[in-house]
Amino acid sequence: MELKIGRAIISHALKDLDEYSDVDVAIVGAGPAGLTAARYLAEKGLKVVVYERRFSFGGGIGPGGNMLPKIVVQEEAVPILRDFKVRYKPAEDGLYTVDPAELIAKLAAGAVDAGAKIILGVHVDDVIFRGDPPRVTGLLWIWTPIQMSGMHVDPLYTQAKAVIDATGHDAEVVSVAARKVPELGIQVVGEKSAWSEVSEKLVVEHTGRVAPGLYVAGIAVCAVYGLPRMGPIFGGMLMSGKKVAEVVYKDLMAEAHAVRA
């Protein structure tokens, strides 16, 4: 029995890793923006993989507001809640409260049911680039426990037509690309202190492409462009995820059309 268990895990896991080593879109971070983007991109028929460094979904959703089990979403993001069948309750002035556990579960289920592949426990270490001028064409990754151990282990590769940084406050993928491929012309400014109503609007406005093949969504947008943080209101994260999906899909379709022409 033990042999069969081991062989089943090894053979099926390696098959998945092989299948998703070449994708249309690689998303780094299974938080609200990353999971939202994954669902809307996968629904369009794109091959999508999501890498999450932890062994759980949700990013900053789970702790709620200072560990209180509620988060807030504004009126503009309610259509996305409805898409994912997430229940919400009115608060005041166009704000609604949502249960963090329900939001995590339904965002993840929505992405998976749409066809996205989520792989947990993955630390993205670097990007792949090609060309002059350069374009980001994929990722290098290792398992998170290896990265945490401090051991030097060479990573493996994932090729992608588009890479989305949804890693949160540190904008880890964009930061490493800015540092190691200066020809991309990326500058990571660092996020500012809180100004929620301004940040919720600006994070959506600035969501999109930062360099050829590389996109940013969610709170990582604040880090890249020097925007204020917003705290435990997540409508901007959801809307940012949906917007980056729309931008990536439009760009990939335009590139495919140009190749055919």
Swiss-Prot record:
It catalyses: hydrogen sulfide + glycine + NAD(+) = ADP-5-ethyl-4-methylthiazole-2-carboxylate + nicotinamide + 3 H2O + H(+). NAD(+) binds at A33, E52, R53, G60, V124, H152, V153, D154, I219. It is an enzyme of class 2 (transferase). Disulfide bonds: none annotated. Keywords: Iron, Metal-binding, NAD, Thiamine biosynthesis, Transferase. Fe cation binds at D154, H169. One of its GO terms (biological process) is thiamine diphosphate biosynthetic process. Its cofactor is Fe(2+). It comes from the Archaea. Pfam families: Thi4. Its EC number is 2.4.2.59. InterPro entries: FAD/NAD-bd_sf (IPR036188), Thi4_fam (IPR002922), Thi4_prok (IPR022828). One of its GO terms (molecular function) is iron ion binding. Pathway: Cofactor biosynthesis; thiamine diphosphate biosynthesis. Glycine binds at R229. Coiled coil: none annotated. Homooctamer; tetramer of dimers. Belongs to the THI4 family. Involved in the biosynthesis of the thiazole moiety of thiamine. Catalyzes the conversion of NAD and glycine to adenosine diphosphate 5-(2-hydroxyethyl)-4-methylthiazole-2-carboxylate (ADT), an adenylated thiazole intermediate, using free sulfide as a source of sulfur. This is Thiamine thiazole synthase.
